[in-house]
C-alpha cells in the first residue's frame, strides 16, 4: 500500500533510467545539481544515495531483523484475505488512476490504435482498476480486450461496480498469479501485453517460479510484460515498524498485506531465464517536504520483458 503516489509531479518524461545507466547518457527529469537547492522543489529524479544514507538504511534493516513477525503462517496461507479487507474498507478511493501508464509504457498505445486489430491486455493485480481506466480512456481500438484479474474477490467487485467498467472491452475475474491453474477465460499464448504494476511484490519468493511459468504460458511469442514495483531500500521498507519482517526483504504492512523489495539483479535472475530483457530500469526519486524540511528517498523498479 503506497501512501506516496509516484505520479505526484506532472512530468513529460520518464523518471526511469537503466540500471547500467552512464552519466554521459541523455535523460529527462528534474536533476539536483547543487545540494543547497534540495528544498527548491518537491521532487528530484535520479538522486544517487550517498554513503550516509546507505549506512542509515543498513542500520535500519538490521534493527528490523531483531523484531520479525511472530506468526508467519497467518500471512502465508491465505494472503488474499488481507486484500479483501483492504478493498472492503477503501474500495476505489485509496489509489489514484495511473495516468502515467502510457508515458512509461508507450508500447500500450500501439494496441489502442483504431487500426490495431484484435489485441489483448492482461492486467494482473488489477486492484480497484487504476491501471485499466486510463487505458480505456485512451483506447480507439474496437477490437481491444482487457482481462483484469486479482486474487482478491473484493477487488474484482470494486472493478465491476465502477461506472467506467465496460464488458465490451473488459473482463474482470478472480485469479491467483502464483496458482497452479491458468485462467479458463484466456487461451494459452494469446496475450499481447501483460501489466504487472505493484503486483509481483505481493508474492512470496517461493511463488515466483510458478508465477513466471504462468506468465510465459499466457503471453504470445513477441508479447511483452510491463513491470513496475518497489525497489530495495525504498522509503516504505525503511519505515517498516517492529514485527513486520517475514524474511529477508519481505514484509507485511500494517493491514496485513505483503510486500517484497526487489533489486534489478533479482529481476534478471527471475525473469531472464524465460524472457528477453528489453528494459531493466530504476527510478530513484527524492521527495521533499519543503515545509517540514524532510527528505524522503523513493525507489521503484521498472522493466520490460519479451517472450
From Swiss-Prot:
Keywords from the named record: Methyltransferase, S-adenosyl-L-methionine, Transferase, tRNA processing
Signal peptide annotation: none
Matches recorded under SUPFAM superfamilies: S-adenosyl-L-methionine-dependent methyltransferases
Pfam families xref list: Methyltransf_12
Effect of disrupting the coding gene: Cells lacking trm140 show abolished N(3)-methylcytidine modification in tRNA(Thr). Cells lacking trm140 and trm141 show abolished N(3)-methylcytidine modification in tRNAs (tRNA(Ser) and tRNA(Thr)).
Top-level taxon in the UniProt lineage: Eukaryota
GO BP annotations listed: tRNA C3-cytosine methylation
InterPro entries from the UniProt entry: Methyltransf_12, METTL2/6/8-like, SAM-dependent_MTases_sf
Function: S-adenosyl-L-methionine-dependent methyltransferase that mediates N(3)-methylcytidine modification of residue 32 of the tRNA anticodon loop of tRNA(Thr). Does not catalyze N(3)-methylcytidine modification of tRNA(Ser).
Family: Belongs to the methyltransferase superfamily. METL family.
PANTHER family: METHYLTRANSFERASE-RELATED, TRNA N(3)-METHYLCYTIDINE METHYLTRANSFERASE METTL2
Name assigned to this protein: tRNA N(3)-methylcytidine methyltransferase trm140
Gene source species: Schizosaccharomyces pombe (strain 972 / ATCC 24843) (Fission yeast)
Amino acid at each position: 500500500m503506497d501512501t506516496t503516489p509516484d505520479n505526484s509531479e506532472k512530468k513529460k518524461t520518464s523518471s526511469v533510467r537503466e540500471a547500467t545507466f552512464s552519466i554521459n547518457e541523455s535523460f529527462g527529469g528534474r536533476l539536483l545539481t547543487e545540494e543547497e537547492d534540495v528544498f527548491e522543489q518537491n521532487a528530484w529524479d535520479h538522486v544517487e544515495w550517498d554513503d550516509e544514507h546507505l549506512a542509515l538504511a543498513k542500520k535500519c534493516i538490521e534493527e528490523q531483523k531483531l523484531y520479525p513477525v511472530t506468526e508467519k503462517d497467518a500471512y502465508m496461507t491465505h494472503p488474499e484475505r488481507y486484500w479483501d479487507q483492504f478493498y472492503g474498507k477503501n474500495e476505489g478511493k485509496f489509489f489514484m488512476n495511473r495516468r502515467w501508464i502510457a508515458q512509461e509504457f508507450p508500447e500500450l498505445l500501439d494496441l489502442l490504435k483504431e487500426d490495431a486489430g484484435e489485441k489483448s491486455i492482461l492486467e494482473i493485480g488489477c486492484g480497484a482498476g487504476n491501471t485499466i481506466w486510463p487505458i480505456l480512456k485512451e483506447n480507439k481500438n474496437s477490437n481491444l480486450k482487457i482481462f483484469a484479474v486479482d486474487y482478491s474477490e473484493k477487488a474484482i467487485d470494486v472493478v465491476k461496480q465502477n461506472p467506467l467498467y465496460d464488458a465490451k472491452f473488459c473482463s474482470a475475474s478472480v485469479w491467483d498469479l502464483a496458482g497452479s491453474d491458468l485462467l479458463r477465460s484466456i487461451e494459452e499464448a494469446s496475450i499481447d501485453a501483460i501489466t504487472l504494476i505493484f503486483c509481483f511484490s505481493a508474492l512470496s519468493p517461493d511463488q515466483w517460479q510458478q508465477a513466471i511459468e504462468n506468465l510465459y504460458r499466457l503471453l504470445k511469442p513477441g508479447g511483452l510484460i510491463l513491470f513496475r514495483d518497489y525497489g530495495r531500500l525504498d522509503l516504505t521498507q525503511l519505515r517498516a515498524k517492529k514485527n513486520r519482517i517475514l524474511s529477508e526483504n519481505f514484509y507485511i504492512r500494517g493491514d496485513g498485506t505483503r510486500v517484497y523489495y526487489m533489486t534489478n539483479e533479482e529481476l534478471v535472475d527471475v525473469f531472464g531465464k524465460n524472457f528477453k530483457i528489453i528494459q531493466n530500469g530504476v527510478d530513484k526519486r527524492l521527495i521533499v517536504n519543503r515545509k517540514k524540511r524532510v527528505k524522503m528517498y523513493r525507489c521503484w523498479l521498472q522493466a520490460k520483458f519479451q517472450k
